[in-house]
Amino acid sequence: MNYQVLLYYKYMTIDDPEQFAQDHLAFCKAHHLKGRILVSTEGINGTLSGTKEETEQYMAHMHADERFKDMVFKIDEAEGHAFKKMHVRPRKEIVALDLEDDVDPRHTTGQYLSPVEFRKALEDDDTVIIDARNDYEFDLGHFRGAIRPNITRFRDLPDWIKENKALFADKKVVTYCTGGIRCEKFSGWLLKEGFEDVAQLHGGIATYGKDPETKSEYWDGKMYVFDDRISVDINQVEKTIIGKDWFDGKPCERYINCANPECNKQILVSEENETKYLGACSYECAKHERNRYVQANNISDNEWQQRLTNFDDLHQHA
């Protein structure tokens, strides 16, 4: 495989995010890179793909900048680009928590745990493990025994914690996410909220999955990623499928977006059921006039109506 996917972030000061984004985009395009990078006054958060030569040049370029000289890159081999385009965008935050009183992880964040230390936390009955990702990420793969917050956006996590605070009373709290960036801010927020013993998996699931000592122990399923790959394997020793098909509950790791553009819900579904249910999550979405699956597959009105009857068995409409 001649391509690499880079995942990285750093909380630091960027004085002029707009100018930085403009210059950085030009550099990335000149090196034929594709991906998504967010920059703000609080730092940089990026994931991009390119050939090994191009991504190595990018990392060397970043490390030559005093501001990014110690930035850690998580690297995955790939068969091709993981993105279709290259975007570098200035933002208010590099990860959106939307707090009234923002948290600066450079000053307030949970204790960092190495993969080995995190594995010990997983084995400790007095430690609560909180998955700081969205529910659809959790449903594809997670650490055994972790708590699944019922959220679809990171910014909703603080409210969910407040509503379920009784679950964590007098416990040590350890949190984890994909690459570590969400936990940096989230664990700092937990400390501000009065949780006294807070820690985080340093480098996230991506780092744990490559650790030679832990060998991905206690991880089940796949890790969701925000690029064209959708998911990657983490546990190289014991592979399990924990995802369940939206319609029949059978083991499934295939994500699609609901074909109704006004819904766009992510669901796990087999190719067979995607065909059967017109790429939609519900009867209402399947019959929507702008159903993308119907349009893309040139399905006739008669066939459309026929497949809608498949929902009768699901009792999803009156």
UniProtKB/Swiss-Prot annotation:
Keyword terms, alphabetized: Oxidoreductase, tRNA processing
InterPro entries hit by this protein: Rhodanese-like_dom (IPR001763), Rhodanese-like_dom_sf (IPR036873), Rhodanese_C (IPR022111), TrhO (IPR020936), TRHO_N (IPR040503)
EC id: 1.14.-.-
Biological process, per Gene Ontology: tRNA modification
Catalysis: reaction(s): uridine(34) in tRNA + AH2 + O2 = 5-hydroxyuridine(34) in tRNA + A + H2O
UniProt-listed Pfam families: Rhodanese, Rhodanese_C, UPF0176_N
Record-annotated Rhodanese domain positions: 123-217
Molecular-function GO term, any one: oxidoreductase activity, acting on paired donors, with incorporation or reduction of molecular oxygen
Active site (record annotation): 177
Superkingdom per UniProt: Bacteria
HAMAP family attached to this UniProt entry: TrhO (MF_00469)
Annotated function: Catalyzes oxygen-dependent 5-hydroxyuridine (ho5U) modification at position 34 in tRNAs.
Family of this protein: Belongs to the TrhO family.
Protein name (record): tRNA uridine(34) hydroxylase
